[in-house]
Curated annotation (Swiss-Prot):
UniProt cross-link Glycyl lysine isopeptide (Lys-Gly) (interchain with G-Cter in SUMO2), position: K430
Source organism per UniProt: Homo sapiens
Presence of keyword Chaperone: yes
Modified residues (Omega-N-methylarginine): R535
PROSITE patterns: TCP1_1, TCP1_2, TCP1_3
Superkingdom per UniProt: Eukaryota
Annotated phenotype, changing E379K: Found in a patient with developmental delay, intellectual disability, pyramidal and cerebellar signs, cerebellar vermis hypoplasia and hypoplasia of the corpus callosum; uncertain significance
Lineage summary: Eukaryota, Metazoa, Chordata, Craniata, Vertebrata
Keywords tagged on the record: Acetylation, ATP-binding, Chaperone, Cytoplasm, Hydrolase, Isopeptide bond, Methylation, Nucleotide-binding, Ubl conjugation
Gene Ontology biological process terms from the UniProt entry: binding of sperm to zona pellucida; chaperone mediated protein folding independent of cofactor; chaperone-mediated protein folding; positive regulation of protein localization to Cajal body; positive regulation of telomerase RNA localization to Cajal body; positive regulation of telomere maintenance via telomerase; protein folding; protein stabilization
Primary localization class, coarse: cytoplasm
GO cellular component terms, semicolon-separated: cell body; chaperonin-containing T-complex; cytoplasm; cytosol; extracellular exosome; microtubule
Protein name as annotated: T-complex protein 1 subunit eta
InterPro entries: Chap_CCT_eta, Chaperone_TCP-1, Chaperonin_TCP-1_CS, Cpn60/GroEL/TCP-1, GroEL-like_apical_dom_sf, GROEL-like_equatorial_sf, TCP-1-like_intermed_sf, TCP-1_chaperonin
Protein role: Component of the chaperonin-containing T-complex (TRiC), a molecular chaperone complex that assists the folding of actin, tubulin and other proteins upon ATP hydrolysis. The TRiC complex mediates the folding of WRAP53/TCAB1, thereby regulating telomere maintenance.
Length: 543
């Protein structure tokens, strides 16, 4: 008698296992790498991605591109996640980490097809990664923090390396200096929140500026605003979460009115409530009043008569940055505006930038903060500039915390490749082949740099292998002269942390994908979502 089959999974569940599904997962990861392969390096191309809502994004940043791709393959999502983690951890090297992970998998694919056990591959990869990380730490060059001039030079070079593959690479010296200035203005915690980036359309990139303080766009203002002064020295700043508008209180109360005088008394009380608030603010000594909620026309004119400046509907993050920079605290009532809840700064002024007016707070005593004001033409271009600066800022922060650097341009990868290849020849068994495969995979970075620049990769890699075998540790691809060069001398520097993180993350992702032996996809729920309730009559949009 036939045994009854045990049905464990729901009908329609897609389950695949064994070597074919592992090979399929590896192939999916290679497809993801293909998407960002051409963006690597100073001659990398950009991608134009249009999302479901029709918003266009032009980007060269691996993490941004992978976030915008709607990846559904479960194994390929792992690569998207490591690119995101690299972006969050060190800010740069997102394309490199994706390429490395895909190349590690590509190199072990033949061994997987031949039936080599995944655990042997994972063991070899972990050994190779540990050796590579130790080697980076051993050969990385440490820059002395005590020498401020040297340290600044190092930081600028690291920022320029991060910016050289971006759209703004032509202005990398200009922006690298600004980025280093910005990070140097921060306190020891180097909080990213304390650097604001505002974009103003129009003008050239070189018109961008760095403000040593807080800056935000002038908010919507009512009549009477033009009478207010636009510049103060050492003002006190009131930060409020209070609505300063005339409110009809009859909406909030039920009142029986017998005479006209009673009604007049109610109207007078409404005015008095508002004037009472305004007087308290005036008596507190504040010269600049910022509120998250609207400040109406009556209040605007009241402040103008008393030489005070006000701005309502200030975005919350700008209000918080002003509070962190100028001191004080955001008040939800005006009843206790004492001196210790008011902020201070050296200069407040409103200035025209392009077609916009901006409010500037400079010389803030409390916390070090700064704001980039970016200029440029197309909106997409300015957004890409903002992403590029974010990468450079992250790199400079990392370089301050960990002061060891390595040479970029494929130099460190070639050196590690040579070191691991030599090591693999000293060990017996299957590990030798796998560590050799890991070493070969590292060459994808210089190879892709050559391919993206249109060079003969085979020729340049042969030269690099020969030079590294002779002891030229820092030799990498010279993009400008279609040759190889000592990239440490050429100041193509990046923090050792970037490379360590990239190698570790790529190796972990490769091990994770190799260790999966079965993929089970549950069927999509077939129950239709409940239809949206019909809109009220006369309110529905036309279908």
């Amino acid at each position: 008698m036939m045994p009854t089959p045990v049905i464990l999974l729901k009908e329609g569940t897609d389950s695949s296992q064994g070597i074919p599904q592992l090979v399929s997962n590896i192939s999916a990861c290679q497809v993801i790498a293909e998407a960002v392969r051409t963006t690597l390096g100073p001659r990398g191309m950009d991608k134009l991605i249009v999302d479901g809502r029709g918003k266009a994004t032009i980007s060269n940043d691996g993490a941004t591109i992978l976030k915008l791709l709607d990846v559904v393959h479960p194994a390929a999502k792992t690569l998207v996640d490591i690119a995101k983690s690299q972006d969050a951890e060190v800010g740069d090297g997102t394309t490199s980490v994706t390429l490395l992970a895909a190349e590690f998998l590509k190199q072990v694919k033949p061994y997987v097809e031949e039936g080599l056990h995944p655990q042997i591959i994972i063991r070899a990869f972990r050994t190779a990664t540990q050796l590579a990380v130790n080697k980076i730490k051993e050969i990385a060059v440490t820059v002395k923090k005590a020498d401020k001039v040297e340290q600044r030079k190092l930081l600028e070079k690291c920022a320029m390396t991060a910016l050289s593959s971006k759209l703004i690479s032509q202005q990398k010296a200009f922006f690298a200096k600004m980025v280093v200035d910005a990070v140097m203005m921060l306190d020891d915690l180097l909080q990213l929140k304390m650097i604001g980036i505002k974009k103003v359309q129009g003008g050239a990139l070189e018109d961008s500026q760095l403000v040593a303080g807080v800056a935000f766009k002038k908010t919507f203002s009512y009549a009477g605003f033009e009478m207010q002064p636009k510049k103060y020295h050492n003002p006190k700043i009131a930060l409020l979460n209070v609505e300063l508008e005339l409110k009809a209180e009859k909406d909030n109360a039920e009142i029986r009115v017998h005479t006209v005088e009673d009604y007049q008394a109610i109207v007078d009380a409404e005015w008095n409530i508002l004037y009472d608030k305004l007087e308290k603010i005036h008596h507190s000594g504040a010269k600049v009043v910022l509120s998250k909620l609207p400040i109406g026309d009556v209040a605007t004119q009241y402040f103008a008569d008393r030489d005070m400046f006000c701005a309502g509907r200030v975005p919350e993050e700008d209000l918080k940055r002003t509070m962190m920079a100028c001191g004080g605290s955001i008040q939800t009532s005006v009843n206790a505006l004492s001196a210790d809840v008011l902020g201070r700064c050296q200069v407040f002024e409103e200035t025209q930038i392009g077609g916009e007016r901006y409010n500037f707070f400079t010389g803030c005593p409390k916390a070090k903060t700064c704001t980039f004001i970016l200029r440029g033409g197309a909106e997409q271009f300015m957004e890409e500039t903002e992403r590029s600066l974010h990468d450079a800022i992250m790199i400079v922060r990392r370089a301050i915390k960990n002061d060891s650097v390595v040479a970029g341009g494929g130099a460190i990868e070639m050196e590690l490749s040579k070191y691991l290849r030599d090591y693999s020849r000293t060990i017996p068994g299957k590990q030798q082949l796998l560590i050799g495969a890991y070493a070969k995979a590292l060459e994808i970075i210089p190879r892709q740099l050559c391919d993206n620049a249109g060079f003969d990769a085979t020729n340049i890699l042969n030269k690099l292998r020969a030079r590294h075998a002779q002891g030229g540790t820092w030799y990498g691809v010279d993009i400008n002269n279609e040759d190889i060069a000592d990239n440490f001398e050429a100041f193509v520097w990046e923090p050792a942390m970037v490379r360590i993180n990239a190698l570790t993350a790529a190796s972990e992702a490769a091990c994770l994908i190799v260790s999966v032996d079965e993929t089970i996809k549950n069927p999509r729920s077939t129950v239709d979502a409940p239809t949206a309730a019909g809109r009220g009559r006369g309110r529905g949009r036309p279908h």
